[in-house]
Amino acid sequence: MSSIISNSLRILNSETFAKRIAEQPTYLFIGKDTSWADEELPDIPTESTKDLTQLYKNMLAVKRVTADTMTSVIQRINWTSNSVYDAFDDTLNMIDDRKSNGTRYRYYALTDEFNVYKCLSNNNGAASVNKPTSQQITEFKTPDGYIWKYMYTIRSTDVFSFLTQDWMPVYTIIANDGSSQWQVQENAIDGGIHDIVVKTNGASYNPAIPPTVVITGDGTGATAQADVHPISGAITRILITNPGVNYTTATVTLTNIGSGNGCTSVAIIAPVGGHGKDAKLELGGVNKMIKMTLNGAEGGAFPTTTFRQAGLLYKPLSTEQGSKITVASTNGFKAGETVTGDTTGATGVIRLVDDNERTLWIDTVVGAFIQSETISSDGVSAAIERVVNNTNLVLVSTVASADDVVTRTGEFMYISNREVIARNDTQTEEVRFIIGF
């Protein structure tokens, strides 16, 4: 038996991850102000109990991750003149498959205007010399014979935050933002045929009266025309004049061929939804980049020293105490509101709501909540299923020193050992992680 994890599931997992850490306190941590045995060769991180415990001991400070500090990314491929780009091929997984030489498929390109284009046809493997610039809804042909599809433009704020030498942001828009990308998504052609690849050119076709291209399949409307070499009579290219719609299978034949013979070709069908419908899925947005900025001492929480470890710590506990309450439903409860127990009269302020675990973290507690009583807040109520009073509360502050984090609480989600980074109170560091799914 063989199986794969689909890119759709990988993207779903990446979005679930991003949503979870945006809603529940997750922190960048930095640590280890002491030297590695070899400062140019940091230790390889492990998840042994001993090493995870040592991470807490090494920890210097933490800063909370927010939704605007992360985005989906794909490998950066720049458009450069005289480079060959791979044309989309519906028989390949161009995200994960590799060429015979082990390299990735280069089937999209980023221009210096921060536009991203998908290559639908590369003029039989020719070099691209004309930069694509159009943001039109449909695919377009450049003078060098390439056919490109505009996908999206990297947002100006993301250029500075998430565009690096190796990675670039990728988006699929879920609501009309007035952008060209939205128009491309809304007008994508499901099951369109945007390229026909000539496998064998044949010979002796009449250039004065080119053969008729017939596309047969389960869709409708696709048409194309053949280019014939003026001397050999070979079919040099078949150009799409109408991509049609709703094809899942298609064959290409030539009629009115005269004495011509030997040409074979294959229709390339667009992905589900059509080219440009889902840039994140089409280009392989299975990675998340998290970019955190550390500004000097961060108000005193961060020491201005060296560090050699960084990573993500999910829901650590703080040294502050209060109540952890599991309820039948957290629906309607909001952080910052006061809750009251209907039996005990105990009160407290909601610090954090965790819908997945049906948990309310309560600080500023007066009295003691008990199991089975009902708690109420601003017209919302729920029965307590379990309560732990006088317990350490989840950390929610924006920044905190290591002394504010309870050792061996929370979950390490990412660990990075690196060469020494020296800090000072006038310095800003940018720390980036790539999380793959």
Kindly give the residue locations of the regions a language model identified:
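Tryptophan-rich substrate-binding surfaces of secreted polymer-degrading and adhesive proteins
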Residues: 1-188, 266-271, 314-320, 340-341, ...
